[in-house]
Amino acid sequence: MATAQSVEVRFTYSGPTGKEARLGSGEMRRQFGLKLHAQDACNLVYAIWRIEPESKLVVSVKRNLGAHSSAECGNRGYQNIKPGKASAVPRLTPGQSHTLRAEMKRDELRVFVDNHEVWNGVVGSDAATLAGPVGIRSDNAQLEFDLKARKPEGTVGQGKPCKAGDSD
């Protein structure tokens, strides 16, 4: 069973990147968010602030049993999770600063923007079994940020370091 995790990022949105890339699905999207229990590139929980084409917060569980790299799973295995309770996120414009925080305990996830809860729900028992570090994801968004994360209680040692390269 995964331990509780909490991650917070304070960021300033600077606008789109100079060069934009489509997602693996072919969709053009600008977004930024948090990874939780990131076992690897194929098995993790996302709390994503979609900037364009539509401003909203989306929580997804990406699960691909037996796959561990982006080359193995691509953009397969995503399941968007419906919240028990949700509220709108502000539309991001260049120059704005905000705080995005996610707290996951067992299969329950809470997401906050500027200390206001914007998403609360159950991500499922599959997500609760994932074990790995927190991180960030950014697609076509230019940001400056500070990431804060507490070491989960009861953990020893370090997780695998992030690697540069193509993501999905």
Regions found by a protein language model. Give the residues of each.
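Surface-exposed coil/turn segments at beta-strand junctions on protein surfaces, enriched
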Residues: 2-4, 27, 91-95, 129
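Flexible glycan-contacting loops in extracellular carbohydrate-active proteins
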Residues: 121-149
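Activation corresponds to long, low-complexity, non-globular regions
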Residues: 157-168
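Hydrophobic residues embedded in beta-strands of well-ordered beta-sheets
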Residues: 55-58, 109, 143
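Carbohydrate-binding surfaces in secreted/extracellular proteins
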Residues: 9-11, 92-126
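Surface-exposed loop/edge segments in extracytoplasmic proteins
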Residues: 43-44, 116-121, 158
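Secretory/extracellular carbohydrate-interaction modules
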Residues: 1-74
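Short, aromatic/His-centered strand-loop micro-motif at the edge of beta-sheets
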Residues: 67-99
